[in-house]
Amino acid sequence: MKKILVIGDLIADYYLWGKSERLSPEAPVPVLEVQRESKNLGGAANVANNLISLKAKVFLCGVVGDDLEGEHFISALKARGIDASGILIDKTRCTTLKTRIIAQNQQIARVDKEIKDPLNADLRKKLLDFFTEKIQEIDGVILSDYNKGVLDFELTQAMIALANQHHKLILCDPKGKDYSKYSHASLITPNRTELEHALHLKLDSHANLSKALQILKETYHIAMPLVTLSEQGIAFLEKGELVNCPTIAKEVYDVTGAGDTVIASLTLSLLESMSLKDACEFANAAAAVVVGKMGSALASLEEIALILNQTHPKILSLEKLLETLDQQKIIFTNGCFDLLHKGHASYLQKAKALGDILIVGLNSDASIKRLKGDKRPIVSEKDRAFLLASLSCVDYVVVFEEDTPIKLIQALKPDILVKGADYLNKEVIGSEFAKETHLMEFEEGYSTSAIIEKIKRTCND
């Protein structure tokens, strides 16, 4: 279990839910008939709550007021299993409270109660002391800045310096226009509007997006520059090139707290040694879960897995496939199927004609790299699996990580194992577990290698 320290502005989110069907006689404003009320952890506490939902151990550091809202807030943190030992009481301010008024599941108003003054020197020292005490114990840090007075320039830079000194990952969710405040952070997560305001640059093209991210890297020394683009996903730099991770969300009901979900899921993904691209895909999936709910919602690992795996109903794990099959004549074949072409489709159609259920074992990306070198595959396993599953002749697709499909064949025990005719007089792996092995002729003139060579020639001309 990863240990993550979250520091930032703590916000109590309060919701009034109801219906509004008339205007007030006192003024031209809607009247809400309240049907229920709810309270959520907001701001940095919502980041912490998201991390708890993703099975992390969380230490939260910030301030609340000396009031009833502050007491309830700390109680709610403890109830969620969040370590609240870093929460300080500021007698000079109220607990930040945002009240959202929801009618027919639409937000019609918000009322904010807050004090944005910077913390006094004593509180700032106590926060930094807590940070210093915990830094060796934790795996990563998130600075959640809502511009409410906790993370001023000096404190932010001191925490980033300490994190770097101890070789800890530190991510910042920025606010304001001065990004030098976050310089030397591992990663920051501005949205498009925030980054445009900070850099005075319109992000209306790939060129400007790339330029903005280069500025973050070269001017502010952000190790992994990134920008969130709402419905267009997340953009980042990889070896100096702009990469876009498209969004996954199908329906958007409420974007409240989506940024908190993104930074929480990015942090955990990177701490689990995911690549930045994979971490962005994971964060997009987590965001897709929460924007499909009302209020500052949470995404569980199970919900994220469902989103990531909802590529095609025919793409199953071996375990799920074995549960599905029922006394039918099973045909099995396997391959890389990189750059799917007519020859592949013809081969699979002929294989399907031999029985009832055609199962295709698909080499994973890692498997292909071992077999064919680092430049392959051209098409990712997720996309290759989706294309195969889209063929009417294919009933199920199972991705395997090994160099050969022997484990799949042994588990499935197919009626017919289909391989290409080029296996004539060669050993067919797994044939001992099939009732029959059938060698199928390929359609002449079609191969992935030929397509790659044609593309190379075209590019060179």
From Swiss-Prot:
Gene3D superfamilies: 3.40.1190.20, HUPs. Pathway: Nucleotide-sugar biosynthesis; ADP-L-glycero-beta-D-manno-heptose biosynthesis; ADP-L-glycero-beta-D-manno-heptose from D-glycero-beta-D-manno-heptose 7-phosphate: step 1/4; Nucleotide-sugar biosynthesis; ADP-L-glycero-beta-D-manno-heptose biosynthesis; ADP-L-glycero-beta-D-manno-heptose from D-glycero-beta-D-manno-heptose 7-phosphate: step 3/4; Bacterial outer membrane biogenesis; LPS core biosynthesis. Pfam families: CTP_transf_like (PF01467), PfkB (PF00294). ATP binds at residues 191-194. Residues 1-315 are annotated as: Ribokinase. Its EC number is 2.7.1.167, 2.7.7.70. CDD domains: RfaE_like. Keywords: ATP-binding, Carbohydrate metabolism, Kinase, Lipopolysaccharide biosynthesis, Multifunctional enzyme, Nucleotide-binding, Nucleotidyltransferase, Transferase. The keyword Transferase applies. One of its GO terms (molecular function) is heptose-1-phosphate adenylyltransferase activity. It is an enzyme of class 2 (transferase). InterPro entries: Bifunc_HldE, Cyt_trans-like, PfkB_dom, RfaE_dom_I, RfaE_dom_II, Ribokinase-like, Rossmann-like_a/b/a_fold. It catalyses: D-glycero-beta-D-manno-heptose 7-phosphate + ATP = D-glycero-beta-D-manno-heptose 1,7-bisphosphate + ADP + H(+); D-glycero-beta-D-manno-heptose 1-phosphate + ATP + H(+) = ADP-D-glycero-beta-D-manno-heptose + diphosphate. In the N-terminal section; belongs to the carbohydrate kinase PfkB family. Homodimer. Catalyzes the ADP transfer from ATP to D-glycero-beta-D-manno-heptose 1-phosphate, yielding ADP-D-glycero-beta-D-manno-heptose. This is Bifunctional protein HldE. It comes from Helicobacter pylori (strain ATCC 700392 / 26695) (Campylobacter pylori).
